[in-house]
Regions:
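Hydrophobic alpha-helical segments
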Residues: 16-409
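N-terminal secretory signal peptides that target proteins for export/translocation
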Residues: 1-2
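Bacterial N-terminal signal peptides
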Residues: 5-14
């Protein structure tokens, strides 16, 4: 009890700002009625009766089911940041986007440990105060700011986070935030119902976390192996021609998370009802909405290498006049989903299915969510574009166009 009270007083600044989030308990109550929702996609069979619906929703892309489950578990329970802080970031994102489904899946895990209950008690309805410098408020505030805007973390806020967390931990906090931004868009796009078992606290007896002893990040065997594997794959399938991308160089500071994300992405890309150029149109549109310079450059490079005319690429920076009806359907959906994850309707998804088929509609959802992740990771960390990407971008948009577009530090 004393520990809880001390933690509560230490984190009172968390509750100091104007209230603007739904209470956690109200989201949990709403998740009960969401058990009756009808998913917009067929759900895979669940003989054991304990598979999350966000995994079952990949029945049309079955090779991605296990990597999705592994991604969720890895991001939360591996690394050097305590799982409860990462779950708190996920629950805060559920509050920001008003997602009962994401709330119940993070709250049940927080509720299962003493530390989780301490953190849960501090997640009220208010945004994080910028004056608070406790480890908890820095981590949750970082995830909150990055969720609200790709460039939402200020230099001062980032410096405060860096003063408490090392580079690997900052990447871990970032990928955690990115993963939950992916997940909330995925589950809300597909109107996934709450599983009855999700209302019960998780059995935490099999979990364990040990804080690292070293004051700095150590290069692990896993990190070395993961980077070697990724470099080999990059050489074999270098579709953008930029080599080992800076996004990967940064991501592998958290090797377990980077490997889980790559495994999920590789499995997802085995399905191509929607062709690569159209997926690049989707990610270009999402990156433009989010103002992500790094990912916009990559999509321009990809589209140009796929044979898209430079005149069309020029027009796409201004309006949709050069898009085909098929492209426009995907792009308009992606923009709507990017701006407000819980805003799309059954009619919106039905239109996707009519144009792209059932599997193609799911691929549009996944590609949109991919860049909710990647935009926040790359420009959130202010990663520089690779020289080859800048070269091609300026060949299309003119000399100096990249400098005028890049993030001002």
């Amino acid at each position: 009890m004393i520990r809880i009270l001390i933690a509560g007083f230490a984190l009172l600044p968390l509750l100091a700002a104007q209230s603007n989030y739904p209470p956690v308990q109200s989201l949990i109550e709403r998740s009960k009625s969401a058990m009756n929702r009808t998913a917009r996609v067929p759900l895979a069979e669940d003989p054991a009766g304990h598979t999350p619906n966000f995994v079952r929703a990949l029945s049309l892309t079955p090779k991605a089911q296990k990597p999705m489950a592994d991604l969720f578990e890895t991001m939360i329970y591996q690394g050097s940041v305590e799982p409860e802080l990462k779950l708190a970031i996920g629950l805060r994102i559920a509050q920001i986007y008003n997602s009962p489904y994401l709330a119940v899946h993070t709250e049940r895990r927080l509720r299962s440990t003493e530390r989780g209950r301490e953190v849960l008690a501090l997640l009220g309805t208010t945004p994080i105060s910028s004056s608070s410098k406790t480890p908890e408020s820095l981590a949750i505030g970082y995830g909150e700011a990055l969720t609200k805007a790709v460039l939402g973390v200020t230099n001062d806020q980032f410096a405060a986070v860096k003063a408490r967390y090392n580079d690997s931990q900052v990447v871990e906090l970032t990928t955690t935030t990115c993963m939950f931004n992916y997940l909330v868009r995925f589950v809300e796009a597909l109107a996934l119902p709450t599983e009855p078992w999700a209302l019960q606290a998780e059995d935490a007896s099999r979990r364990g976390f040990h804080a690292p002893e070293a004051r700095i990040s150590l290069i692990s065997d896993a990190q070395i192996t993961a980077v070697e594997t990724a470099q080999k794959q990059s050489r074999e399938n270098n579709t953008l021609g930029v080599g080992f991308a800076n996004s990967m160089r940064a991501m592998f500071l958290n090797p377990a998370g980077a490997t889980a994300w790559r495994n999920y992405g590789n499995a997802s890309r085995e399905y191509a009802s929607v062709d690569r150029p159209l997926k690049l149109h989707i990610s270009f549109a999402v990156s433009m909405v989010n103002g992500c310079r790094y990912c916009t450059v990559h999509q321009v490079v990809g589209l140009r290498r796929a044979g898209v005319d430079p005149n069309k690429l020029m027009a796409m920076k201004k309006d949709d006049s050069q898009l085909s009806p098929r492209e426009l359907t995907a792009v308009e959906y992606a923009r709507k989903r990017t701006r407000a994850p819980n805003s799309t309707t059954d009619a919106d998804y039905q239109k996707l299915k009519e144009v792209f088929g059932e599997q193609g509609a799911l691929e549009v959802v996944m590609q949109t969510a991919n860049f909710a992740y990647m935009n926040r990771f790359t420009d959130g960390l202010r990663l520089p574009s690779e020289d080859e990407g800048v070269k091609i971008y300026q060949e299309i948009y003119g000399e100096g166009s990249y400098e005028s577009y890049r993030v001002k530090r």
